[in-house]
Amino acid sequence: MAFFGLSRVSRRLLKSSVSVTPSSSSALLQSQHKSLSNPVTTHYTNPFTKCYPSWNDNYQVWSKGRELHQEKFFGVGWNYRLICGMSSSSSVLEGKPKKDDKEKSDGVVVKEASWIDLYLPEEVRGYAKLARLDKPIGTWLLAWPCMWSIALAADPGSLPSFKYMALFGCGALLLRGAGCTINDLLDQDIDTKVDRTKLRPIASGLLTPFQGIGFLGLQLLLGLGILLQLNNYSRVLGASSLLLVFSYPLMKRFTFWPQAFLGLTINWGALLGWTAVKGSIAPSIVLPLYLSGVCWTLVYDTIYAHQDKEDDVKVGVKSTALRFGDNTKLWLTGFGTASIGFLALSGFSADLGWQYYASLAAASGQLGWQIGTADLSSGADCSRKFVSNKWFGAIIFSGVVLGRSFQ
């Protein structure tokens, strides 16, 4: 139950609104027992709204698909419908990091409020969630290979181009959002059957497929504006990645290796970043960099896929989590080792300094920690390990910058 620090005024309001006397206590318990056997939906009125009218504006989540939720208030059971889907978790009110993005209570999924629910106008919340703006880890994972490549393309003794890093950062945000929109449009029949995804905007009915297609058009148009800032070679190379972006969501229906296909897609920036700076490709440098990203993706996205493995079996979709099974950590160790090896080969071809190899040692430790400590039976722990990969990317980037700057 969410903890409410009560002021004197609030306690007075509560006292006047909820008073339990010995004579009424038994009646309340009897009525509560009766309500449990024959549930009646009533509306819960937060006493804070009498003193602070903005309370509901800040902490109510306007979304669809919420069901009856039971809460206990000072020892008295109350049945009420979560008005507009307000979460009962204390992490939102107290500002603490949430352990998981959902809680289950008797089969009911309660979604925690994000900054989108608290601060954005109601009209745009669905679109912001469709682009996963409240979950930036996907943008980081798409952006880091681009940044590695841009830093590798810098001249010896120089820092990477801030112009290209800014362009690719914005491009990563837009392309990741477009990829999520495409994924939700193609997977809406699957998302409704998986606990983790059933509240996504299109699957839950918050947005229609037509609205999703219109939003996708806007995302791609903005992405085109960024692509046109690059040279002709990079424009063609960047546009060719759309085939992978549109194909990836379908792979889980046909192969146990959709994570490998995601690796080919999300690490395309390892090729594009270099060509944007240099105007051509250097296979001995960027191909090992690209392959290292693919192997890295197989590590983190397999860990991520273990969150949904039970639902995947029920729905009939495939993943490396199901393919590897009990041997997952052995496979991940192999892919992690290959990723570090390809990174070392790329750095050697680029003639980077010793600072780069020191960063590889640190990145190896981070990746080994992920694989060694991941609890693949815990969705929350898999999610935490997945999110930690932004630090792996940051370590490699810092190593490339230092190795090139002191070259």
Swiss-Prot record:
It catalyses: an all-trans-polyprenyl diphosphate + 4-hydroxybenzoate = a 4-hydroxy-3-(all-trans-polyprenyl)benzoate + diphosphate. Pfam families: UbiA. Residues 1-20 form a transit peptide. Pathway: Cofactor biosynthesis; ubiquinone biosynthesis. GO terms for molecular function: 4-hydroxybenzoate polyprenyltransferase activity. Keywords: Isoprene biosynthesis, Membrane, Mitochondrion, Mitochondrion inner membrane, Transferase, Transit peptide, Transmembrane, Transmembrane helix, Ubiquinone biosynthesis. Gene3D superfamilies: UbiA prenyltransferase. The chain crosses the membrane at residues 137-157, 162-182, 210-230, 254-274, 279-299, 330-350. Disruption phenotype: Arrest of embryo development at an early stage of zygotic embryogenesis. Expressed in flowers. It is a multi-pass membrane protein. This is 4-hydroxybenzoate polyprenyltransferase, mitochondrial. The lineage of its organism: Eukaryota, Viridiplantae, Streptophyta, Embryophyta, Tracheophyta. The gene is PPT1.
